[in-house]
Amino acid sequence: MPLIGDLNRWLPVRPRVADDDALPLFCLPHAGGGASAFRSWQDGVPGTAVLPLQLPGRESRLRESPYQDMDSLVAVIATVVSTEAAGRPFALYGHSLGALVAFETVRALRRRGRPQPVHLFVSGCSAPSCPADDGPPVGGMAVPEVVQMLRRLGGTPEWLLADAGALETILPPFRADFSVKETYEYRAEPPLMVPITVLASTDDPRAPVEQQEMWLGETVGPVRQHTLAGGHFAVFEQGALTRSLLTEALAQWVG
């Protein structure tokens, strides 16, 4: 089992009021994203402790080398999740690349014989069995091409895209995360026994609605899909609606 070091490096954003009865909701961000993507969700999902994961290479872990392959990343995240949950019920949420990482984390926990989450939430991500069609590898793109792609996806402030110094900070983890995605190989395993909620959006260039519907084949548990109006980051742009859907799905697990 991989060593994780200081757990606070991985989980830097804690609920302001500790509640031992709160359901841990581990959140994994999109490519290049950090824990701050979920900061506004604090106290927004009643009965849960929203715990965004901070991956190396960004924000408070800027000087650390980011992971570049799925297996290594998932191995350590599975350890972080099982250590923090400590046998309590928990849920997982992942957006875009984070959805794939969350899914593979659940499968890694199963292989270890560890408890499964009570619910898996995925957004902005085609089902893992879908053939990837993301265009040219990001690692080979020139900076202007990467900026153009980020601008097309949305979610990155324009001032940041126009700042050469800021780009030097955000592009390395972004490229590394895309290496995780581009080298990922889906391996068939028995379906999970975990309920899945899929949060799709009407105009997502990286995850068409019909490809998100195929998450149905990844579990024998119930699957529910909600489709939000908007693009790749609709779940954050409509945060109140997203949090209400999470609250509804977790109602039986929270007080």
Where are these regions (language model features)?
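Domain-scale detector for complete catalytic domains at protein termini or as standalone homologs
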Residues: M1-Y93, L100-G255
